[in-house]
């Protein structure tokens, strides 16, 4: 197929106008999943019969009524559906969610028909989707390469045209990295924009959030309206927008002061990733923005990684406790992958005082980082330091962790600071693999990023660029 499939906004319009039915669109999407998934391994839990029943019934009259959708199998719990989190012990025990998350209720109320749940690395702990429990997801642009992670199953599904948009989540880059590696739009919202409830209040000391991967800025903006909102007991609440995010698409962002950070002396960044950022800088100048080489002094603080890893390690140890409760016995070393067992073991050795010290450190560091936006509007950087790596490169038991640390240098900072950041598909490598560019805005100002992203989408459209495995 050489013609791009409609985005979710267009599909919703077709349904409302009577030019298509939800049953037709859901059947078409299921056919694509069944035909393509043997190549990319994106969908690990199917609910096709339930989806067909929902499509034929009375759907909520939301903005995406009847549009097919997929949900990442990490969080976004769906009552009665599997929730394996990429883990074999949860898979083998047949663990299912007891109740819908607030997020999934919002997705359902918007009218989406969910076809299934997508592949994710175990516990979302890395930026490639190669769980031992379900096998690797493969990049539709080149099946020998990674989709990124941890939302790699969702990204592969959207890139291949199975559905126009899919749920994703991000604790250190897990929306932006798969979006970068699969040629999609991937917005990480501000902290407190989307509720984790009722199952949780926060993740990784406030670093995690949900979102989507999509093929258009307008889909991403409209979906942020769907997913946003506070619920009783939420520990963080983002400042509400002045108008719907969907209304920001097409609005002139004005002349922005933009800092460009194509590389850093302490980070070995692939020249093609550097070139992607430099090309984005040139395009921004052509659009009338003020662009200069600049970045926050705190961006590459040498202490950051140590404190972030401490927080993630403790959270992993807590995951083990919760997983044990779900399967009815303690989690042992044979129940999880080696890298996660190591991370959880580190977490178990961290004292309460040391954990609180790390949380306090990242809070103080975040204030230093965010101060840069007092003088600038947007920071532009690589998403990840290499183009999409081969399958197995990051999951290698001997070198995977070292490689992960070396390339994941540009995204976790904004999980910790809580700022919105988006990956846009503006560049392709000489080998034909997507390389996204990251744009970071001030806290709670997704609206600014949406205006800028839509301007860039118009100036350098990507919708017609399709992978070899598509539709």
Task: Write out the residue ranges for each language-model feature.
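Acidic/His- and Gly-rich active-site-bordering loop/insert found
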Residues: 51-133
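Acyltransferase
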Residues: 19-27, 56, 101, 244-247, ...
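An N-terminal boundary/leader segment
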Residues: 1-50, 286-288, 344, 348-349, ...
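A short helix-breaking turn/cap at a secondary-structure junction
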Residues: 188-281, 451, 459-470
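Short helix-loop capping/hinge segments that flank enzyme active sites or metal/cofactor-binding pockets
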Residues: 64-89, 250-262, 311-370, 420-433
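Short glycine/serine-rich loop segments
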Residues: 99-231, 415-436
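Serine-dependent amide/ester hydrolase catalytic core
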Residues: 10-16, 31, 108, 264, ...
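Residue-level signal for inorganic ion chemistry
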Residues: 29, 51, 220, 258, ...
């Amino acid at each position: 197929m050489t013609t791009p499939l409609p985005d979710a906004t267009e599909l919703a319009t077709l349904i409302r106008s009577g030019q298509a039915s939800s049953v037709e669109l859901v059947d078409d999407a299921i056919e694509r999943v069944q035909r393509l998934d043997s190549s990319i391994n994106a969908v690990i839990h199917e609910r096709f019969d339930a989806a067909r029943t929902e499509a034929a019934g009375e759907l909520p009259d939301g903005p995406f009524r009847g549009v097919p959708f997929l949900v990442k199998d990490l969080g976004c719990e769906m009552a009665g559906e599997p929730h394996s989190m990429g883990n074999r012990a949860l898979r083998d025990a047949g663990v299912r969610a007891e109740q819908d998350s607030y997020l999934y209720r919002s997705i359902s109320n918007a009218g989406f028909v969910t076809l299934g749940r997508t592949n994710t690395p175990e516990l979302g702990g890395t930026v490639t989707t190669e769980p031992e429990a379900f096998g690797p997801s493969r990049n539709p642009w080149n099946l020998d390469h990674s989709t990124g992670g941890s939302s790699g199953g969702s990204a592969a599904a959207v890139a291949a045209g199975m559905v126009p948009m899919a749920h994703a989540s991000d604790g250190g880059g897990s929306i932006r990295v798969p979006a970068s590696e699969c040629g999609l739009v991937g917005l990480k919202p501000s902290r407190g924009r989307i509720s984790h409830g009722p199952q949780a209040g926060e993740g990784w000391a406030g670093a995690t959030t949900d979102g989507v991967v999509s093929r258009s800025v307008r889909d991403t903006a409209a979906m942020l309206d769907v997913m946003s909102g506070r619920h009783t007991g939420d520990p963080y609440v983002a400042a509400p927008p002045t108008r719907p995010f969907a209304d920001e698409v097409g609005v002139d962002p004005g002349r922005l002061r933009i800092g460009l950070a194509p590389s850093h002396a302490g980070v070995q960044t692939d020249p093609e990733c550097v070139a992607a950022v430099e090309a984005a800088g040139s395009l921004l100048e052509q659009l009338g923005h003020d662009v200069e080489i600049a970045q926050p002094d705190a961006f590459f603080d040498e202490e950051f990684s140590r404190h972030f890893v401490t927080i993630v390690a403790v959270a992993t140890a807590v995951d083990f406790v919760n997983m044990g409760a779900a399967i009815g016995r303690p989690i042992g070393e044979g129940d999880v992958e080696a890298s996660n067992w190591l991370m959880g073991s580190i977490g178990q050795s961290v004292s309460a005082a040391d954990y609180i010290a790390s949380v306090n450190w990242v809070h103080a560091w975040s204030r230093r980082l965010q101060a840069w936006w007092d003088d600038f509007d947007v920071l532009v950087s690589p998403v990840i330091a290499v183009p999409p790596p081969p399958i197995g490169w990051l999951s290698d038991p001997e070198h995977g962790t070292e490689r992960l640390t070396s390339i994941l240098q540009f995204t976790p900072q904004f999980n910790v600071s809580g700022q919105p950041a988006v990956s846009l598909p503006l560049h392709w490598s000489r080998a034909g693999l997507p390389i996204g560019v990251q744009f970071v805005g001030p806290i709670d100002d997704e609206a600014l990023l949406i205006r800028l992203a839509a301007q860039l989408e118009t100036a350098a459209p990507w919708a017609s660029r399709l992978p070899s495995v598509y539709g």
